[in-house]
UniProtKB/Swiss-Prot annotation:
One of its GO terms (cellular component) is cytosolic large ribosomal subunit. GO terms for molecular function: structural constituent of ribosome. PROSITE patterns: RIBOSOMAL_L30 (PS00634). The keyword 4Fe-4S does not apply. One of its GO terms (biological process) is translation. Belongs to the universal ribosomal protein uL30 family. PANTHER family: LARGE RIBOSOMAL SUBUNIT PROTEIN UL30M, MITOCHONDRIAL RIBOSOMAL PROTEIN L30. Keywords: Ribonucleoprotein, Ribosomal protein. The keyword Ribonucleoprotein applies. Pfam families: Ribosomal_L30. CDD domains: Ribosomal_L30. This is Large ribosomal subunit protein uL30. It comes from the Bacteria.
């Protein structure tokens, strides 16, 4: 079974760069406090690094 991580949106996407909004959508996040469980892959880690200031990651 692949390792998973929990990603929670902690800040609003309003007023952010369009690419950063699209990255949140790509991660499956919709609103503040929303948590998703994703596979721990390099692609997902790269998306998280792009919007690190808006999300919280739990292993």
């Amino acid at each position: 079974m692949a390792k998973t991580i929990k990603v929670t949106q902690t800040k609003s996407a309003i007023g952010r760069l369009p690419k950063h909004k699209a990255t949140l959508t790509g991660l499956g996040l919709r609103r503040i406090g929303h948590t998703v469980e994703l596979e721990d892959t390099p692609a997902v880690r790269g998306m998280i690094n792009k919007v690190y200031y808006m999300v919280k990651v739990e292993d």
